[in-house]
C-alpha cells in the first residue's frame, strides 16, 4: 500500500537561484490489487512524484521535502535507499538509465542477485517475467543491440522479476508498438490479480481503460482533479480536450489508422522525389534487418514509418540520413546517387533518445549549433512556438522528457534542411504538445521539406501523415509501402 500525505518538494535552481515548487500538497492512497493512473501536461511534476515514491527524492536530489510517504506502512524517510528496492520496483522514463549489465538475462537477474536470492528462484522469476513481457527470445541478446521499445519491455520485465509489492512505471509505453502495449496491459492485469500496488504515469491513456481504479490529474505540482477509473473513461471528448489529455480511444494497429489532418503534401502532385531508395538492404552480421527496400519521399509530404519494435525502423532511418552504410542498394537525392556525407548534410535528424543530441548549456545554444541565425528574436520566437520560452535559462539536460523532445525538434526546424527525419517524436508528449508538433511538421513540409517520421503513435499519425509505410519482421521489407492516409 502507498500512503502519501501533504507531500511538497522544492529546490533552488542552480542556474537562476529561484525557488522551484516541484510538488505542492500532494495526497495519494493506493491499495494492493489496484492501479492508479497519474496524468497531466509535460513538466507538471509527475516524474518528480514518482522519484519521491522511490526515495530518490530527496536522498539523491537535494531539496526541501515536507509531508510523508509510506509504503507498506514504512516511512520512506527512515528507509535506507539500498533497502527501498525491497518495497518497490520502478521503470524510468528513459530505460537506458537503469541498466547495469551486458545481456537481457543478466539484467533480469541483477536485482535478485544483489539481494542474495536463491539461484533457482532467480532463474524462475527472470524467465516468468520475460515470458510475460514477450521478450523470452531476447534473453541472450546484448542490451546494446536492442531497439528503444525492446529496452522498455526489458525494463518492465526487470521490475516484475524483482518481486517487490509495488510497481512504479513512468510512461512505460512511450516507445512501444500496439502489440507491445497489449503485452504491457496483460502484464498489469496479471500483477493486479496478484495483489500488487501499481502507479502508472502516462500520456497514452487508452490502454488503461478498464484497468485504472483511480485517476489523478496533476497541474503545476499539485493534484487538481480525481476520478474513479469508470468516471474518467466516461468523459466526453470535449471534457478531455479541455483538460489537455490525449485520446481515450485505442487507435488500433497501423492498418486501422485513418488521417484526419494530413493535407496531402505540396510535393505530391508531380515533382520528382527528394529522397529515393532502390533495393536497399542491411544486415547485422548474418542477420538481415531489411532487404530490397524501395521508397520515394517527396518534398511537402509527411511519411510515417510504422512496424513492430525491433523490426528495423531506426536502422532504416540511420541508413537514409547517412549515419549507417547499407550493405547494398542505392539512395538518391533529387534524382542523383548520393554519398553518406551528402545525405548527412541534407538531413536533420531527431533521435529516439533526444538526450544524446543535446550539447549546449542553454536552449538557445542548441538552436544555433545547426543554424547560426537562430539567435536573438528568431531563437526566442522558435522557443515560444514550442512552449519553451519560459525555460530559456534552464540547462537542456535538466528538462523533462517531453521538453527535451520539443527542443530537439525546434533545433531541427531551425536548421532548415531539405529532409527532416524524426524517430518517435511524440514519446513523452502530452496532448497540447502533440498538436503543436503535428502543426510544426506540417509547416516544415509546406515549406518544402520531405518529412519522414518513425512512429508507433496512431493518434499522431492519423493527425499528420500523408502516407504510411509499414515494415514487417518477415524480411524487414515494406509490407504496406505508399498507403495514403
Language model features with spans:
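Helix-to-loop junction immediately C-terminal to a conserved catalytic motif
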Residues: 54, 321
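ABC ATPase NBD Q-loop/coupling interface
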Residues: 68-83, 330-343
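Conserved ABC ATPase "signature" region
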Residues: 120-138, 376-391
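Conserved ABC ATPase signature
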Residues: 142-146, 150, 395-399, 403
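Hydrophobic anchor residue at the start of the ABC signature
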Residues: 156, 409-410
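ABC ATPase C-loop
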Residues: 159-160, 412-413
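Catalytic Walker B motif of ABC-type/P-loop ATPase nucleotide-binding domains
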Residues: 167-170, 420-423
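H-loop/switch region of ABC-family ATPase nucleotide-binding domains
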Residues: 202-203, 455-456
Amino acid at each position: 500500500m502507498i500512503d502519501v500525505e501533504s507531500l511538497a518538494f522544492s529546490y533552488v535552481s542552480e542556474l537562476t537561484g529561484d525557488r522551484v515548487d516541484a510538488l505542492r500538497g500532494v495526497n495519494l492512497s493506493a491499495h494492493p490489487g489496484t492501479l492508479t493512473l497519474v496524468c497531466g501536461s509535460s513538466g507538471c511534476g509527475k516524474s518528480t512524484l514518482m522519484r519521491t515514491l522511490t526515495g530518490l527524492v530527496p536522498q539523491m536530489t537535494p531539496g526541501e521535502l515536507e509531508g510523508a510517504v509510506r509504503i507498506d506502512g514504512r516511512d520512506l524517510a527512515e528507509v535506507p535507499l539500498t533497502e527501498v528496492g525491497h518495497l518497490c520496483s520502478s521503470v524510468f522514463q528513459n530505460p537506458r538509465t537503469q541498466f547495469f549489465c551486458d545481456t537481457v538475462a543478466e539484467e533480469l537477474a541483477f536485482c535478485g542477485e544483489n539481494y542474495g536470492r536463491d539461484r533457482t528462484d532467480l532463474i524462475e522469476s527472470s524467465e516468468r517475467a520475460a515470458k510475460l513481457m514477450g521478450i523470452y527470445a531476447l534473453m541472450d541478446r546484448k542490451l546494446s543491440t536492442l531497439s528503444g521499445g525492446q529496452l522498455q519491455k526489458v525494463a518492465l520485465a526487470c521490475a516484475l522479476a524483482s518481486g517487490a509489492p509495488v510497481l512504479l512505471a513512468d510512461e512505460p509505453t512511450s516507445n512501444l508498438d500496439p502489440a507491445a502495449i497489449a503485452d504491457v496491459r496483460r502484464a498489469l492485469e496479471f500483477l493486479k490479480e496478484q495483489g500488487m500496488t501499481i502507479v502508472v504515469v502516462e500520456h497514452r491513456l487508452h490502454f488503461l481503460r478498464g484497468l485504472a481504479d483511480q485517476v489523478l490529474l496533476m497541474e503545476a505540482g499539485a493534484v487538481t482533479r480525481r476520478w474513479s477509473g469508470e468516471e474518467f473513461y466516461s468523459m466526453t471528448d470535449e471534457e478531455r480536450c479541455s483538460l489537455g489529455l490525449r485520446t481515450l480511444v485505442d487507435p488500433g494497429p497501423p492498418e486501422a489508422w485513418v488521417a484526419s489532418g494530413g493535407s496531402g503534401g505540396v510535393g505530391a502532385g508531380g515533382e520528382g522525389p527528394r529522397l529515393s531508395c532502390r533495393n536497399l538492404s542491411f544486415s547485422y552480421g548474418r542477420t538481415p534487418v531489411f532487404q530490397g527496400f524501395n521508397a520515394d519521399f517527396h518534398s511537402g509530404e509527411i511519411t510515417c514509418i510504422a512496424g513492430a519494435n525491433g523490426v528495423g525502423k531506426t536502422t532504416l532511418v540511420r541508413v537514409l540520413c547517412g549515419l549507417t552504410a547499407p550493405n547494398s542498394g542505392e539512395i538518391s537525392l533529387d534524382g542523383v546517387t548520393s554519398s553518406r556525407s551528402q545525405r548527412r548534410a541534407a538531413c536533420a535528424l531527431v533521435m529516439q533518445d533526444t538526450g544524446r543530441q543535446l550539447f549546449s548549456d542553454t536552449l538557445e545554444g542548441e538552436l544555433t549549433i545547426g543554424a547560426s541565425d537562430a539567435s536573438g528574436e528568431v531563437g526566442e520566437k522558435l522557443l515560444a512556438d514550442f512552449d519553451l520560452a519560459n525555460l530559456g535559462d534552464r540547462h537542456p539536460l535538466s528538462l523533462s522528457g517531453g521538453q527535451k523532445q520539443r527542443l530537439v525538434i525546434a533545433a531541427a526546424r531551425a536548421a532548415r534542411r531539405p529532409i527532416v527525419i524524426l524517430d518517435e517524436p511524440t514519446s513523452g508528449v502530452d496532448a497540447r504538445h502533440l498538436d503543436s508538433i503535428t502543426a510544426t511538421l506540417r509547416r516544415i513540409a509546406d515549406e518544402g521539406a520531405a518529412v519522414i517520421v518513425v512512429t508507433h503513435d496512431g493518434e499522431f499519425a492519423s493527425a499528420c501523415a500523408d502516407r504510411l509505410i509499414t515494415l514487417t519482421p518477415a524480411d524487414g521489407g515494406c509490407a504496406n509501402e505508399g498507403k495514403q492516409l
